[in-house]
C-alpha cells in the first residue's frame, strides 16, 4: 500500500507542478485587468453553503469589445474598434442558476448617439443655403464634439451682425448636455477661426482703428450714418423775434377799420410805416457731424458694457441735437419756418462753459458708445448676445417681452482646456445647462441684439459661438425615450455556456433592467447560464448610433449562488440508479428461482421442486438410518433437525417471496445505510422514509471542491503568495486529490458491498437448503459470514472516514478560509533601479500581473503568509483517509473470520483502474511509466556497457603503446 501511495503522490506532485506552470502562463494573460470580481468567504446572510460573488464588468456604449490595429500615415499603429463588431452582447462571466437572485448597480455615463449641426444654424439658414444649411461643402453632416471630449476643440459658428434673427445652435433632447462658448474679442491682432463648412481656416485683421470688422473679430456695431459730435454757435443764422417796423408819422397814426388798423394819414410823408413786420438776425447752435460708428479702440472708450437691460445697450443718436429744430434749415424769411432754435443738447454735447465757436467738451464725448464686444468690456458676458429655447427651431426676428442675455458661467465651471498655456481664454463658456424638460425636443437659439426697426444690413462685425454637445446622454443605467424608444436601458439575456449569442444566429428575448436613481436594480434569473449584457440603442441605419456612441458603464454584480450539492447532483442519481438496478436484479433472481407468479414456467426453474426433493430425501434418509439403528438421536438433535426441516419447508410456501421482499430484503440491504447515517448525523430520506444516500457527510466538502467557485478561487489564490505560495498550492492540491481518490474508493467499496449483499440475498433459497446436510453445512455458514461481512464492511469503513472528513473540512477552512478578489498580485519592477535611477523611483512597478489574491492583501506591503502547520495537518489527514480504507477492510476480515475477496479490495481495484484510465490520457498511467522507466533503464545499461567497452579498449591501447615503447627502448 505504501509503495502504491508513494507512486500516486509522485504522480500528483508532477501534475500539480504542471498545473503551476500552466497557471503561471495564465498569469501573464492575467496582466491584463479583466475586472475586480470578488468571491466572498460567506454570503451576506452568513450562510457558508453559498458562494457570495461580486464582480464588476465594463459595458461599452458602442457594444464593441474587439480592437484591431490600424496603420497611421506616419507609420505608427493605433488600436481601433473592429468595424464589424458593433452592437454585440458582452459575456459578464457571471454564472447563475434559474431563479437565482442577482443584485447590481450601474455606474457611469454614456452618450448613445452623436450630435450634428442643426439646420437654420447661426451661420446658414435654409434661405441662404437651401437644403444644405447643415451640410459642409462636401455634402456631409457636421458632427459636434462631445462635452467630455477634452482633446477635441468645439466647432465654431460665425454670427454675422447683419443677421438680426433667431438661429439654431443645437438640437436638444431630454438629458442632453451642451456647452456653448464665445470666442474672445480679438484686439490688436488677427483672428483665426475654423470654418467647419469649408474645412479651412479663416484669418482676418482685427486690429483697432477700424469702423468695420469681420464677424470673427468678436465685436459688432449696429450704428451707421451720421451723428452729432460738436455744436457751433452760428451768428445771424436765422430770422426771428418778429416785430413791427417803427412808425414816423408826424401827427401820429390813425385807426381805420377797413384797412390796416394803424396807418398814417395822407398828410404824412411815410405811408404805411406802421404796418411792416421785421425780424432780428439771431444766432443758433448748429450740429457738427461725424460718421458712425467711430473707429474701434481697444481701450473700450467706444464700447458698451454688458447689461441685461436693452435700454442700457442703445443710444438714440438721432435724438441728440445741439438746438431745437436744428435739422430744419432756415429759409431766410421773416419770420423763419420755425420759431424755436433754442439750445437743446448743446451743454451735453459741447459743454456748459463753451459759449462760442465749436464746442465739443460736453459729457457726451465721454459717453459715446458704438461697439458691443464678446468680452463684455470686462462684464458678466458677451454684450448684446441673447438666447432662447424654441420648440420647432424656426427662424424669426420677433423679440420676446423678456430677453435672456448670455452670461459667462462661474470661473469654477470653465473647462481648463479652454485656456491657452498663458491662462488666456480661447473660448469662454456662456451656457452649460443640461436640457431637462417635459418637451421631447427643443432648439437652443441665439441672436445679436439690435432694434427690430433698424436695418440690420448696415451692421458690422459679429461674434463666433462655439458648441460642444453630448447627445443621448444617459447615466447610471437610466433610460427614456428620445427619437428611439427606451434608449439607454441595460438589457440582459441568459445563455448556456456553450452558446455565443453574437454568432449563434438564434433570436433571444432580452430583459430590460429597471434601475433607481442610483443605478441599483435586482432581478431573478429566468433560466440557468451566463449573463450577457448590452446597452439598448437604435440598431437601424447600419448600427450608426452604436458606432457613434461613447462612454461605458461599470456594472457591479453581487449575487449569492447556492453551491451545487454533491449529494443531490452526483451521489443521489448514481446510487439511486445503481441500487435500483441491483435490487431489481436480486429480486429477479429470487423470483426466477421460485417462479413467483409466473404464468409461463419455461422462462424459470421452480426451485421449490428441488427443495421438496431434498427435504423428502433428507427425511427418508434420516428415518431409515434411525430405524436401522445407524443414527442415534437425542432431544437436542431432534429439535435442531425439526427446526431445519421447518425452515427449509417454509421455502416451499408460495408467500416466500413476499416475506423476503417485505421484511428481510430491505432490512438487510439498508442495514449499512441506516448505521452510517446515524453515525454521521446526516441522513437523506425519500418519500417512503427510507435512507437513499448514506454519503451525506461528504456533501459539504465535496460540494465545495467540485462546485464552489469561491473554493477554486481560494485555491488559485495560493499562487499569489510568492514562491512559498507555489509550495502551499502543490501540497494543498495533493491533499485534495488524495481526499477525492479516497472518496471514490469509499464509494466503490460501498457499491461493491451493496451489490454483493443483494446478490447473496437473491440466492438465499439455494444456500438455506444447504443447511440440511452436514457435508453442505459449510456452504451455508460461509454464505452467512460473507453476508454479514458485506453488511458490516461499509459501516466500519465509513465510521473512520466520517471522523477524518470532518477534520479535513476544518483544517481546509483554516488553510483557505478567506475571501478572494481578482487584483494586482505580482508587480514587475526594474531590477537594480537604485544604482541607475534616483531613489524616488524605487519600488515603482512597471506593470502588474493580476490574479486571484486573498482579500486585503496588498502587494506593496508584502505577501501574506499561511500557517504551515495547518497545511501539514491537512496532508496527514488526507493520507490517513487513504490508508484507512484498506485498513478497515482488514479489520472486518478479522472480525467476521471470512476469508476471501473483500469489497475493499474490489473497490480499490476499481478506483485504481479508473485512475489509470484517466492518467493514460496524459501518459502517466502505470504501464506507460513502466515503459518509460524500462526504456530509460535499458538506455542506461547500454550506456554503461558502452563505457565499459570504451574503457577496456583504452586499457588495451595504453598497454599496446607501453609494449611498443619498451621494445624501442631495448633496441
Swiss-Prot record:
One Pfam entry name: TrbL
GO cellular component: plasma membrane
Cysteine disulfide partners in this protein: none
Chain segments annotated as transmembrane: 611-631, 721-741, 753-773, 795-815, 832-852, 865-885
Composition bias, Basic and acidic residues: 938-954
Chain residue ranges for the region called Disordered: 127-146, 933-971
Membrane-protein topology: Multi-pass membrane protein
Coiled-coil positions: none
One GO process term, biological-process aspect: protein secretion by the type IV secretion system
Signal peptide bounds: 1-24
Family: Belongs to the TrbL/VirB6 family.
Record's protein name: Uncharacterized protein RP106
Originating organism: Rickettsia prowazekii (strain Madrid E)
Amino acid at each position: 500500500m505504501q509503495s502504491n501511495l508513494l507512486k500516486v503522490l509522485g504522480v500528483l506532485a508532477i501534475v500539480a507542478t504542471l498545473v503551476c506552470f500552466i497557471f503561471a502562463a495564465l498569469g501573464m494573460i492575467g496582466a491584463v485587468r479583466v475586472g475586480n470580481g470578488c468571491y466572498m468567504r460567506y454570503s451576506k446572510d452568513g450562510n457558508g453553503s453559498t458562494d457570495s460573488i461580486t464582480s464588476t464588468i465594463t459595458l461599452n456604449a458602442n457594444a464593441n469589445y474587439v480592437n484591431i490595429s490600424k496603420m497611421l500615415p506616419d507609420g505608427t499603429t493605433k488600436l481601433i474598434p473592429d468595424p464589424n463588431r458593433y452592437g454585440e452582447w458582452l459575456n459578464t462571466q457571471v454564472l447563475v442558476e434559474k431563479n437565482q437572485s442577482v443584485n447590481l448597480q450601474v455606474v457611469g455615463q454614456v452618450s448613445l448617439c452623436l450630435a450634428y449641426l442643426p439646420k437654420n444654424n447661426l451661420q446658414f439658414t435654409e434661405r441662404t443655403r437651401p437644403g444644405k444649411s447643415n451640410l459642409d461643402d462636401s455634402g456631409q453632416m457636421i458632427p459636434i464634439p462631445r462635452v467630455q471630449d477634452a482633446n477635441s476643440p468645439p466647432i465654431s459658428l460665425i454670427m454675422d451682425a447683419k443677421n438680426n434673427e433667431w438661429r439654431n445652435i443645437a438640437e436638444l433632447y431630454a438629458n442632453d448636455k451642451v456647452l456653448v462658448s464665445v470666442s474672445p474679442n480679438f484686439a490688436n491682432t488677427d483672428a483665426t477661426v475654423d470654418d467647419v463648412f469649408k474645412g479651412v481656416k479663416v484669418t482676418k485683421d482685427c486690429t483697432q482703428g477700424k469702423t468695420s470688422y469681420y464677424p470673427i473679430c468678436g465685436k459688432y456695431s449696429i450704428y451707421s450714418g451720421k451723428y452729432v459730435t460738436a455744436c457751433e454757435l452760428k451768428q445771424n443764422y436765422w430770422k426771428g423775434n418778429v416785430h413791427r417796423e417803427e412808425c414816423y408819422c408826424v401827427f401820429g397814426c390813425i385807426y381805420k377799420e377797413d384797412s390796416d388798423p394803424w396807418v398814417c394819414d395822407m398828410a404824412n410823408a411815410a405811408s404805411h410805416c406802421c404796418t411792416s413786420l421785421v425780424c432780428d438776425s439771431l444766432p443758433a447752435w448748429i450740429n457738427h457731424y461725424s460718421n458712425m460708428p467711430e473707429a474701434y479702440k481697444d481701450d473700450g472708450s467706444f464700447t458698451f458694457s454688458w447689461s441685461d437691460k436693452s435700454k442700457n445697450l442703445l443710444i438714440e443718436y438721432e435724438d441728440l441735437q445741439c438746438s431745437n429744430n436744428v435739422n430744419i434749415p432756415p429759409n431766410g424769411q421773416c419770420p423763419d419756418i420755425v420759431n424755436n432754435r433754442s439750445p437743446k443738447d448743446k451743454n451735453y454735447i459741447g459743454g456748459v462753459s463753451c459759449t462760442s465757436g465749436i464746442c465739443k467738451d460736453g459729457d457726451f464725448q465721454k459717453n459715446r458708445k458704438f461697439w458691443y464686444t464678446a468680452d463684455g468690456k470686462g462684464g458678466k458676458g458677451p454684450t448684446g448676445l441673447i438666447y432662447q429655447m424654441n420648440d420647432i427651431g424656426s427662424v424669426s426676428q420677433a423679440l420676446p417681452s423678456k430677453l435672456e442675455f448670455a452670461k459667462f458661467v462661474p470661473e469654477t465651471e470653465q473647462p481648463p482646456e479652454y485656456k491657452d498655456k498663458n491662462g488666456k481664454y480661447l473660448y469662454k463658456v456662456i451656457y452649460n445647462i443640461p436640457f431637462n424638460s417635459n418637451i421631447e425636443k427643443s432648439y437652443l437659439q441665439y441672436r445679436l441684439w439690435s432694434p427690430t426697426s433698424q436695418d440690420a444690413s448696415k451692421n458690422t462685425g459679429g461674434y463666433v459661438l462655439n458648441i460642444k454637445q453630448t447627445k443621448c446622454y444617459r447615466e447610471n443605467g437610466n433610460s427614456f425615450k428620445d427619437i428611439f424608444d427606451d434608449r439607454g436601458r441595460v438589457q440582459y439575456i441568459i445563455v448556456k455556456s456553450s452558446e455565443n449569442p453574437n454568432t449563434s444566429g438564434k433570436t433571444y428575448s432580452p430583459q430590460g433592467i429597471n434601475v433607481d436613481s442610483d443605478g441599483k436594480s435586482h432581478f431573478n434569473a429566468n433560466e440557468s447560464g451566463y449573463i450577457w449584457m448590452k446597452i439598448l440603442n437604435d440598431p437601424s441605419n447600419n448600427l450608426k448610433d452604436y458606432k457613434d456612441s461613447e462612454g461605458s458603464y461599470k456594472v457591479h454584480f453581487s449575487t449569492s449562488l447556492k453551491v451545487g450539492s454533491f449529494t443531490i447532483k452526483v451521489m443521489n442519481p448514481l446510487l439511486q440508479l445503481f441500487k435500483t438496478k441491483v435490487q431489481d436484479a436480486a429480486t429477479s433472481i429470487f423470483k426466477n428461482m421460485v417462479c413467483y407468479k409466473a404464468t409461463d414456467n419455461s422462462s424459470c426453474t421452480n426451485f421449490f421442486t428441488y427443495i421438496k426433493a431434498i427435504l423428502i430425501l433428507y427425511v427418508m434418509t434420516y428415518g431409515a438410518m434411525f430405524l436401522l439403528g445407524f443414527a442415534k438421536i437425542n432431544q437436542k438433535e431432534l429439535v435442531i433437525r425439526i427446526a431445519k426441516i421447518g425452515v427449509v419447508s417454509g421455502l416451499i410456501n408460495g408467500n416466500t417471496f413476499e416475506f423476503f421482499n417485505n421484511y428481510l430484503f430491505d432490512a438487510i440491504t439498508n442495514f449499512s445505510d441506516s448505521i452510517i447515517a446515524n453515525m454521521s448525523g446526516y441522513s437523506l430520506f425519500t418519500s417512503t422514509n427510507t435512507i437513499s444516500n448514506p454519503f451525506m457527510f461528504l456533501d459539504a466538502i465535496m460540494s465545495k471542491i467540485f462546485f464552489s467557485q469561491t473554493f477554486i478561487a481560494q485555491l488559485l489564490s495560493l499562487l499569489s503568495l510568492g514562491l512559498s505560495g507555489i509550495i502551499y498550492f502543490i501540497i494543498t492540491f495533493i491533499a485534495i486529490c488524495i481526499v477525492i481518490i479516497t472518496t471514490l474508493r469509499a464509494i466503490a467499496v460501498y457499491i461493491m458491498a451493496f451489490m454483493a449483499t443483494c446478490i447473496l440475498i437473491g440466492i438465499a433459497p439455494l444456500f438455506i437448503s444447504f443447511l440440511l446436510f452436514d457435508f453442505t453445512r459449510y456452504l451455508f455458514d460461509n454464505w452467512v459470514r460473507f453476508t454479514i461481512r458485506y453488511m458490516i464492511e461499509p459501516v466500519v469503513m465509513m465510521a473512520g472516514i466520517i471522523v477524518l472528513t470532518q477534520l479535513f473540512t476544518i483544517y481546509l477552512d483554516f488553510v483557505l478560509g478567506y475571501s478572494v478578489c481578482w487584483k494586482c498580485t505580482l508587480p514587475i519592477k526594474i531590477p537594480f533601479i537604485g544604482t541607475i535611477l534616483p531613489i524616488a523611483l524605487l519600488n515603482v512597478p512597471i506593470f502588474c500581473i493580476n490574479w486571484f489574491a486573498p482579500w486585503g492583501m496588498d502587494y506593496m506591503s508584502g505577501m501574506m503568509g499561511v500557517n504551515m502547520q495547518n497545511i501539514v495537518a491537512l496532508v496527514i489527514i488526507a493520507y490517513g483517509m487513504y490508508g484507512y480504507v484498506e485498513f478497515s477492510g482488514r479489520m472486518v476480515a478479522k472480525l467476521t473470520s471470512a476469508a476471501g475477496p473483500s469489497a475493499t479490495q474490489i473497490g480499490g481495484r476499481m478506483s485504481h483502474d479508473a485512475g489509470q484510465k484517466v492518467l493514460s490520457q496524459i501518459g502517466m498511467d502505470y504501464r506507460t511509466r513502466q515503459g518509460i522507466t524500462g526504456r530509460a533503464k535499458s538506455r542506461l545499461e547500454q550506456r554503461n556497457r558502452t563505457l565499459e567497452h570504451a574503457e577496456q579498449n583504452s586499457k588495451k591501447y595504453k598497454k599496446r603503446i607501453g609494449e611498443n615503447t619498451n621494445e624501442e627502448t631495448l633496441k
